[in-house]
Design a protein with these regions (language model features):
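Alpha-helical and His/Cys-centered functional microenvironments
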Residues: 57, 201, 298
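C-terminal motif of bacterial Sec signal peptides marking the signal peptidase cleavage site
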Residues: 15-19
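Positively charged n-region of N-terminal signal peptides that target proteins for export
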Residues: 1-7
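Repetitive helical segments and hydrophobic/amphipathic motifs
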Residues: 11-12
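Metal-dependent polysaccharide deacetylase catalytic core of the NodB/CE4 family, i.e.
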Residues: 139-141, 151-158, 162-292
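Catalytic grooves of carbohydrate-active enzymes
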Residues: 285-322
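N-terminal pre-catalytic segment of deacetylase/amide-hydrolase enzymes
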Residues: 20-144, 150-156, 163, 307-310, ...
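Short acidic donor-binding/metal-coordinating loop in glycosyltransferase active sites
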Residues: 145-147, 295-296
Length: 326
């Protein structure tokens, strides 16, 4: 009897190993390039991290009680602006339909038609918005970063930009300014743009025109008071907007900055290495590109220097958004 039981157990174990091997053989590894051409912040993990930081956000010790009339940057506080909401009830009937920004994958140093058409839509509608510089006849690119929350790589990115003498724009939330004021000070004092990415990172198209203004004003009030700084550049959270939202943002004096080059870099649990980041950006680079990278990505931080060097070897010049002429 014992012998029979032993034989049955042996057969069961063998079958289980066979089953494991069969399951493994069905596993496929997707090695294709990321092909998502829409908003790069749709991933829930990125949004959850921003929400998590917001819930526990406290002002860093660096940002408390300077004991002087100066702000953290050493600049004087700026006077706060009273924004006026034109057409608060949208009686002009501008579309409130949600648009998830799409850009397409550029190839052979040529922008994707999706980006070209997006820029045309902005221009035809007289919206103050940029996704692609189609005016310059030179090989220029604009480097921008979204900083929804801090993951420890912003300082490394700033070090590389300083070493390479490259200007950039950083789009931050109020919570990011509170939790990492040292980096904000560096951005400002080292000549970069700190753009308005709202107070709470909402889908702006889902808000009223007055609520949209309040999100923008809360950011502007905070950076004016604590850093003595303001800039006329705005980025829609999650890349979600509407014509009504574009109009409201422009009426407040801001240019909405989108992008024509990006990739799925925001998932900190799915980083693919610096070489992948470098190759992906360089394979999609094109004249007039507005490049979006996420500062939370270790791949971006490690690849940035090589990306800059290779782009320059290809004849590209990195310019500030301030150099863009609509």
């Amino acid at each position: 009897m014992k012998k029979i039981i032993s034989i049955i157990l042996f057969i069961s174990i063998c079958l289980s190993f066979t089953g494991c091997r069969n399951n493994d053989s069905n596993v496929s590894y997707n090695t294709d390039d990321e092909t998502d051409v829409r908003t790069t912040e749709a991933d829930t993990s990125y949004e959850e991290k921003i929400t998590e930081q917001s819930a526990k956000s406290e002002i860093s010790e660096f940002g408390k009680n300077t004991g002087t009339d100066k702000t953290l940057t050493g600049l004087e506080p700026l006077e706060l602006i009273d924004f006026t909401v034109n057409d608060p009830e949208n009686k002009n009937g501008l579309s409130t339909e949600k648009i998830a920004h799409a850009y397409g994958v550029a190839k052979d140093e040529t922008p994707n038609d999706i980006s070209v058409n997006s820029q045309k839509h902005f221009e035809d509608g007289n919206f103050r918005a940029l996704t692609l510089d189609n005016k310059s006849e030179e090989k220029v690119v604009y480097l921008t970063f979204d900083v929804g929350y801090d993951n420890g790589y912003t300082g490394m990115i700033l070090d590389t930009l300083k070493e390479k003498n490259v200007p950039a724009a950083f789009f931050c939330t109020v919570d990011e300014m509170k939790s990492d004021p040292e980096s904000i000070v560096r951005m400002i004092n080292e000549g970069h743009i700190v753009g308005n990415h709202t107070e709470n990172h909402p889908s702006m198209d889902e808000l009223s025109r007055t609520e949209m203004m309040q999100e923008i004003k809360a950011f502007d009030d905070y950076i004016r008071t604590n850093f003595g700084y303001s800039s006329p550049y705005f980025r829609f959270p999650k890349g979600e907007y509407s014509d009504c939202a574009l109009d409201l943002v422009g009426s407040l004096g801001y240019t909405s900055v989108f992008w024509s080059l990006a990739y799925a870099d925001w998932d900190i649990n799915n980083q693919k290495g610096a070489q992948y980041a470098h190759n992906t950006v360089i394979s999609r680079i094109h004249p007039g590109a507005v490049i979006l990278l996420h500062a939370v990505s270790s791949d971006n931080a490690n690849a940035l220097g090589d990306i800059i060097d290779t782009a320059r070897d290809m004849g590209y010049e990195f310019r500030s958004l301030e150099d863009y002429k609509a």
